[in-house]
Amino acid sequence: MYKIGLTGGIGSGKSRVADMLAEWGASVIDADEISHALTAPGGAAMPAIAREFGPQAVAADGALDRAWMRDLVFREPTARGRLEALLHPLIGLHTEQAAAQARGLYLVFVVPLLVESGRWRGRVDRICVVDCDPATQIARVQKRSGLTEPAIRRIMAAQAARATRLEAADDVIVNDGATSPDTLRARARTLHDRWLALAGAASQPGGKAAGTPE
């Protein structure tokens, strides 16, 4: 199946784009949703997280205490790597299981840290970045989450720089503060149609998909 890696900084609108692609028939696998399920009450990652970070990492309902973890990552630079070492193998396993069951027109992996991970380029046929300016990112995240601007900037600082994401992109969907919902939908539809054509070509004899040797 033809594979798209969809990414973008926090607040860029990649989830909105993913919802549109799913509406049009793509199979969408969201790494963030998998991560949240793994760290929800009873999630598969929670026993290992409790062992690694102690009971203070677990909220009263048994989920990951995200506010506590954000603060720890800010104070202790190694904490992010320790958490990712626990989560990433599980996310990878669940991602592969979901991909094996996908039956859509093509497959979309929504991965916030796709560019940063370095391992996705060989797993997808194209990388699409949903792009917007930092001020718009901050405003959107503040509106939906109530996080302070310094907290949002810390999250942004842990992600790839905007220029780095754009350099890695095969396709870009601009979703800045001036982009209306209709305009965003039109931009996403243009790429959806392009990917459908590419998926069709890749499925023909002699066509190529990600991971296929030259």
UniProtKB/Swiss-Prot annotation:
Disulfide bonds: none annotated. GO terms for cellular component: cytoplasm. It holds the Pfam family CoaE. ATP binds at residues 11-16. Keywords: ATP-binding, Coenzyme A biosynthesis, Cytoplasm, Kinase, Nucleotide-binding, Transferase. It is an enzyme of class 2 (transferase). HAMAP family: Dephospho_CoA_kinase. This is Dephospho-CoA kinase. It comes from Bordetella pertussis (strain Tohama I / ATCC BAA-589 / NCTC 13251). The gene is coaE.
